[in-house]
From Swiss-Prot:
One of its GO terms (biological process) is nitrogen fixation. The gene is nifH. Binds 1 [4Fe-4S] cluster per dimer. The keyword Metal-binding applies. The reversible ADP-ribosylation of Arg-101 inactivates the nitrogenase reductase and regulates nitrogenase activity. The key enzymatic reactions in nitrogen fixation are catalyzed by the nitrogenase complex, which has 2 components: the iron protein and the molybdenum-iron protein. Its EC number is 1.18.6.1. This is Nitrogenase iron protein. One of its GO terms (molecular function) is 4 iron, 4 sulfur cluster binding. It catalyses: N2 + 8 reduced [2Fe-2S]-[ferredoxin] + 16 ATP + 16 H2O = H2 + 8 oxidized [2Fe-2S]-[ferredoxin] + 2 NH4(+) + 16 ADP + 16 phosphate + 6 H(+). Belongs to the NifH/BchL/ChlL family. ATP binds at residues 10-17. SUPFAM superfamilies: P-loop containing nucleoside triphosphate hydrolases (SSF52540). Its cofactor is [4Fe-4S] cluster.
Length: 293
């Protein structure tokens, strides 16, 4: 099997890291050889796989020893549940420098040190929020990741983010092989959520690859710094992540997306009752003016 490099994007706080780690645990359980590269200064992309608060990052360790060139691969790569290989890029202190630069440095280091040569089936990049700036777009800009999955929900801002990320994919698809593999709906239990994300996926020219229902067992596992797959392998939610993993293994629908205009996106949100039609007669009017009308 040729190594597949996948990047997981989505709005901040949508559950990307949790979804990615449970998905990866399911792939490992299936016998796949997987590496996770955390591309977020928070360094929380591997904690459930490693049972750790936060893995030491490549940028932190480079600062301690002097430079990235002074590090060894075994310093930065840890092995977790199911023999999953874990690395965190990290970034500078808040307010200092460009965290995206840390992603670029980290991925280049892993490549140069041969981290990608060990018979891997999948590499997953867990990428910071909905920021598609140059640094955080590194996994797609440099043709590292060729499959993108966007974690979203039926909430308005999560859908805006999915649309914006799709615009970024279109930009880089012109010069490379990057494609959108689908939307993963990490449910927030909003009304008609699955129908809404299926409709959004159709507008983007892609698919909702899986609907992950909300379940408190995810939080119970997280408190123990474990994936659901490891914490309670027989539970219903573990099977949801296994289904997602199998769908990604079998996925052949990889497209250049067709992002919506703002008007199209707002029409979709209005159609599903998430957004009300704008009343232009009240724009710019003070409370006193409205009361006098």
């Amino acid at each position: 099997m040729t190594m597949r490099q996948c990047a997981i994007y989505g709005k901040g706080g949508i559950g990307k890291s949790t979804t990615t780690q449970n998905l990866v645990a399911a792939l490992a359980e299936m016998g796949k050889k997987v590496m996770i590269v955390g591309c977020d200064p928070k360094a929380d992309s591997t904690r459930l796989i490693l049972h750790a608060k936060a893995q030491n990052t490549i940028m932190e360790m480079a600062a301690e020893v002097g430079s990235v060139e002074d590090l060894e691969l075994e310093d930065v790569l840890q092995i977790g549940y199911g023999d999953v290989r874990c690395a965190e890029s990290g970034g500078p202190e808040p307010g200092v420098g460009c965290a995206g630069r840390g992603v670029i440095t980290a991925i280049n280091f892993l490549e140069e040190e041969g981290a990608y040569e060990d018979d891997l089936d999948f590499v997953f990049y867990d990428v910071l929020g909905d920021v598609v700036c140059g640094g955080f777009a590194m996994p797609i800009r440099e043709n590292k990741a060729q499959e993108i999955y966007i974690v979203c929900s039926g909430e308005m801002m999560a859908m805006y983010a999915a649309n914006n990320i799709s615009k970024g994919i279109v930009k880089y698809a012109k010069s490379g092989k990057v494609r959108l593999g689908g939307l993963i709906c990490n449910s927030r239990q909003t009304d008609r959520e699955d129908e809404l994300i299926i409709a959004l996926a159709e507008k983007l020219g892609t698919q909702m690859i899986h609907f992950v229902p909300r379940d408190n067992i995810v939080q119970r596992a997280e408190i123990r710094r474990m994936t659901v797959i490891e914490y309670d392998p027989a539970c219903k939610q573990a099977n949801e992540y296994r289904t997602l993993a199998q769908k990604i293994v079998n996925n052949t629908m990889k497209v250049v997306p067709t992002p919506c205009t703002m008007d199209e996106l707002e029409s979709l949100l209005m159609e599903f009752g998430i957004m009300e039609e704008e009343d232009t007669s009240i724009i710019g009017k003070t409370a006193a003016e409205e009361n006098a009308a």
